[in-house]
Structure formats: structure tokens, C-alpha cells
Curated annotation (Swiss-Prot):
Has no constitutive proton transporter activity and has to be activated by long-chain fatty acids/LCFAs. Inhibited by purine nucleotides. Both purine nucleotides and LCFAs bind the cytosolic side of the transporter and directly compete to activate or inhibit it. Activated by noradrenaline and reactive oxygen species. Despite lacking canonical translational encoding for selenocysteine, a small pool of the protein has been observed to selectively incorporate selenocysteine at 'Cys-252'. It catalyses: H(+)(in) = H(+)(out). It is found in: Mitochondrion inner membrane. This is Mitochondrial brown fat uncoupling protein 1. Its main location: mitochondrion. Keywords: Ion channel, Ion transport, Membrane, Mitochondrion, Mitochondrion inner membrane, Oxidation, Repeat, Transmembrane, Transmembrane helix, Transport. One of its GO terms (biological process) is cellular response to cold. The modification Cysteine sulfenic acid (-SOH) is found at C252. It comes from Ovis aries. The lineage of its organism: Eukaryota, Metazoa, Chordata, Craniata, Vertebrata.
């Protein structure tokens, strides 16, 4: 990411990867209930049993889940979520600057090099982290009160059952929509954040510090949610589906369109934005500060020796 103060030491690749992983895990822990609410809203419409609860809005979904299934249910799938951030966010965010430098031919990084870096790191991270995404979504989606009997008792039980009943390919189910979603998210999120931060710093509107990171993260979160929401909903439905429910990703999208209309593609938009916006703020602020502090500590240790 652009901008280092004169006294700052540019962070190493290892520092960036570590900082991205830690910052993403912190953000996930804080915002996970919003993500669970988003998943429940996105799959609403699939379960047509009379006993199924109807979720209304973000707060209503969170309250309903807490009352009917217990507050702990809001964090169902968190271990898989943290595994996902360690394997996924650490790479897509931590490697972004390094890959961007690879695509940069001139003195300054162009928009094309930023987009290429976002495409590359996002794509690589999806293939590595997809099994954690499948398990996370399925644990968040299953209810103990209505619909089909819960398929999994926990994170590692889910990995085992999916691998034994659906094969290893089951752990990579939904890779295509998730790849599309995360290419959009990675490019929009990182490129928008990078451009916004660069504009604020270069025009001397804000210094390269917490307020600048906060504003840049909010703008990046909104733009990302608008562009990624339709793909995100299809991805969630397809990943959570039972074997044979949908024949393909396009079939899933078409069934959503014919049964529920175009608005189905924006189900859970508000929790998506609240989650992604707040996640971006926490992650980027922690990421930037952690990078800076780690390099200061390293510099102090080098001076001491």
C-alpha cells in the first residue's frame, strides 16, 4: 500500500503476510455475527417448511438467532473462518504490494498493475482457502430448529464428512463462483483502498495514519459490496446446497431468478455492507498499524545489535 513516513522502514513480505493474517482474524472475530446473519438471509427462500423462521433485517436476524438457537450460534463456523483468513487473507492482502511491483514497469504503479495484482493474489488465495470457505458457510447455514437435520457437529467433523461423502472435490465445491466473487472483491477492495489512500495522502487531505485508513476502508467496503453481492449470494447458495440440488452454478442462479426474482441476488446486502465495511475498517487499520509497529521493533532490535 502506498505511503510511508520518512522515518518508516518499508515492511518486508513476511511482515505483510503475518500482519494481514492477524488483522483479518481480529476483524473476523469482531464481525462474525454479521457474516452469519448475512448467510442466513442469503439462503432464506430455499427452506420452504412451515416451521422455518423468517428473518427480517440484520438486527432482527441476529436477535432471532440468539433467542432461538443461542448466542453461540452467531459464531458457528468461526474456527473455519479463522482458518480461512490465515490461509486466504494473509496471501491476497499480504502479497498484493509484492505482486503489484512485479507488474509495474514504470516508476509509479499504474491502475492496470494494481488490478493485475488484485486478480493474481485473489485467484491464488481462493484455490488454497476454498475448503475453509465451504465448511464455514455450511456451519453458519445449518439450523438445529428447522429444515433438514444438521449435517455436522463441528468444524473438523464437517471437513471429514464432506471429504468422505462428497470426495475431495466437495471441499472445493463452489470454487468458480467464489473465484469470481473474490476476484471482484480483491480488485475492488484493495485497488479502491489503494487509490483512495493515495489520493488523500498526495493531495494532503489526510496524513498516512488512522483517519486516512478509516476513510479509505469505508469507501472500499461500499464499492466492493455493490459489485460483489450478486455473485456472493449465488456462491453461498451453491456451496450450502445438498448434492444434486443444483446441477451447476448457472443453474443455481437461474433457479434463484425464476423462483425469487432479481432481488434475490441482493439478499443480505445490508449485513454484507455492514460486515464488509466494518471488517475493512478493522482489518486495514490493524494491518497498517501492525506493519508499522513490527518494522519499528525490528529497526530497534537492529540498532541495539
Amino acid at each position: 500500500m502506498v505511503g510511508h513516513a520518512a522515518t518508516d522502514v518499508p515492511p518486508t513480505m513476511a511482515v505483510k503476510i503475518f500482519s494481514a493474517g492477524v488483522a483479518a482474524c481480529v476483524a473476523d472475530i469482531i464481525t462474525f455475527p454479521l457474516d452469519t446473519a448475512k448467510v442466513r438471509l442469503q439462503i432464506q427462500g430455499e427452506c420452504l417448511t412451515s416451521s422455518a423462521f423468517r428473518y427480517k433485517g440484520v438486527l432482527g436476524t441476529i436477535i432471532t438467532l440468539a433467542k432461538t438457537e443461542g448466542p453461540v450460534k452467531l459464531y458457528s463456523g468461526l474456527p473455519a473462518g479463522l482458518q480461512r483468513q490465515i490461509s486466504f487473507a494473509s496471501l491476497r492482502i499480504g502479497l498484493y504490494d509484492t505482486v503489484q511491483e512485479f507488474f509495474t514497469t514504470g516508476k509509479e504503479a499504474s491502475l492496470g498493475s494494481k488490478i493485475s495484482a488484485g486478480l493474481t493474489t485473489g485467484g491464488v488465495a481462493v484455490f488454497i482457502g476454498q475448503p475453509t470457505e465451504v465448511v464455514k458457510v455450511r456451519l453458519q447455514a445449518q439450523s438445529h430448529l428447522h429444515g433438514p437435520k444438521p449435517r455436522y457437529t463441528g468444524t473438523y467433523n464437517a471437513y471429514r464428512i464432506i471429504a468422505t461423502t462428497e470426495g475431495l472435490t466437495g471441499l472445493w465445491k463452489g470454487t468458480t463462483p467464489n473465484l469470481t466473487r473474490n476476484v471482484i472483491i480483491n480488485c475492488t477492495e484493495l485497488v479502491t483502498y489503494d487509490l483512495m489512500k493515495e489520493a488523500l495522502v498526495k493531495n494532503k487531505l489526510l496524513a498516512d495514519d488512522v483517519p486516512c485508513h478509516f476513510v479509505s476502508a469505508v469507501v472500499a467496503g461500499f464499492c466492493t459490496t455493490v459489485l460483489s453481492s450478486p455473485v456472493d449470494v449465488v456462491k453461498t447458495r451453491f456451496v450450502n446446497s445438498s448434492p444434486g440440488q443444483y446441477t451447476s452454478v448457472p443453474n443455481c442462479a437461474m433457479m434463484m431468478l425464476t423462483r425469487e426474482g432479481p432481488s434475490a441476488f441482493f439478499k443480505g446486502f445490508v449485513p454484507s455492507f455492514l460486515r464488509l465495511g466494518s471488517w475493512n475498517i478493522i482489518m486495514f487499520v490493524c494491518f497498517e498499524q501492525l506493519k508499522r509497529e513490527l518494522m519499528k521493533s525490528r529497526q530497534a532490535m537492529d540498532c541495539a545489535t
